[in-house]
Amino acid sequence: RAKLDSKKRVAILGDGLIGCEFANDLSAKGYEVSVIGLGQWPMERMIPQPLGESLQNALSERGVQWLLQDSIAKIEPMADTCAELHLTSGKKITADLVLSAVGLKPNVSLAEQAGLEIGRGIKVNQFAQTSDENIYSLGDCVETEQGWQPYIAPINQMIPSLAKSLLGEMTPIASTPT
C-alpha cells in the first residue's frame, strides 16, 4: 500500500482473477489502471466469453484500459517515479507502478512432507482423495486427472462430491472442468 501513495498510473500484468481484482479495487480508488493480458477477454481461462466481456465493459466504465492478447516485452525506467512499458504489440504505456498478477503456483510443501503424491499440484482421485485414502484435498493446490485445477469453477464443482464423501457416501466428482 505504501508503494501506491504517490502513484497515479498502475499497470497490471495479468488479466486473470487477481489482475481483475486489482483493477477493480484500484480503479474504485481513482487510479488510472491498465491491464495487460494474454487472453481475448478478462479471466478467459475461468469464465465464458459473454461473462468476461461484461466484466471488461463494467471495469472499462470505471476507466480501466485493456491491452489484451499482449504482453510486456521491456520495461524502461523513465523518471524517478515511472516507467515506459513496451508491449509485444508495439504499443507503449507509461506507469508509475507495475503489478504482476501472473504465475500461480500451488504450495504443496505440507503434502510433500506427509508423503502424498505430487505432480503440478496435490494429486487426487475422482473422490478428491489423495494418495493417502484418509486425506482429501480441495482448492487451487489440487491436480485431478484433467490436470491442475487452480480456478474457482473446478473447486465449486468438487465441493458437493467432497462433502458427501467426507460424510461416508463416496461420491465421484461429476465433471471437473479444465
Each PLM stretch: what is its role?
Residues 1-5, 81-86, 91-164:
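FAD-site-proximal beta/loop scaffold in flavoenzymes
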Residues 9-11, 17-74, 155, 171-178:
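Rossmann-like dinucleotide-binding cores of NAD(P)H-dependent redox enzymes
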Residues 74-81:
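Feature captures the FAD/FMN-dependent oxidoreductase FAD-binding
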Residues 102, 161-178:
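Rossmann-like nucleotide/phosphate-binding core characteristic of flavoprotein oxidoreductases
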Residues 77, 130, 173:
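Conserved strand-loop elements at the edges of beta-sheets that form or border functional pockets
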Residues 4-5, 12, 77:
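Residue-level signal for alpha-helix termini/capping positions
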Residues 22-31, 83-86, 163-165:
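Short, composition-biased local secondary-structure segments
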